[in-house]
Amino acid sequence: MSITAERKQALVAEYANKVGDTGSPEVQIAVLSERISNLTNHFKSHKKDNHSRRGLLKMVSQRRRLLDYLKGVDQNRYQTLIKKLGLRR
């Protein structure tokens, strides 16, 4: 359900604005999206895992808040990020 340290480092390297950037909204959203994707796959076989479902809902809400923040700060960064992650259809 959680992501490996190597995968997290790869996401940080891909979405970071500079070396060592782990706190930017882009990196946080990318890591949350990966965790959300993993949990979504987990629920396909564990439908009654309500404890983890609550964690999933918290992650989705956190990602939504970060996306709203990024949209307010810089519209171009927001657009490139959602295209890169494939969040909007």
Swiss-Prot record:
A Gene Ontology cellular-component term: cytosolic small ribosomal subunit
Biological process annotations from GO: translation
Chain ranges passing through the membrane: none
UniProtKB keywords: Ribonucleoprotein, Ribosomal protein, RNA-binding, rRNA-binding
Annotated InterPro entries: Ribosomal_uS15, Ribosomal_uS15_bac-type, uS15_NS1_RNA-bd_sf
CDD domains reported in the protein's UniProt record: Ribosomal_S15p_S13e
Single GO term (MF): structural constituent of ribosome
Pfam families, alphabetized: Ribosomal_S15 (PF00312)
Subunit structure: Part of the 30S ribosomal subunit. Forms a bridge to the 50S subunit in the 70S ribosome, contacting the 23S rRNA.
Family label: Belongs to the universal ribosomal protein uS15 family.
Function: One of the primary rRNA binding proteins, it binds directly to 16S rRNA where it helps nucleate assembly of the platform of the 30S subunit by binding and bridging several RNA helices of the 16S rRNA.
Alphabetized NCBIfam families for the sequence: S15_bact
Name the UniProt record assigns to this protein: Small ribosomal subunit protein uS15
Name of the encoding gene: rpsO
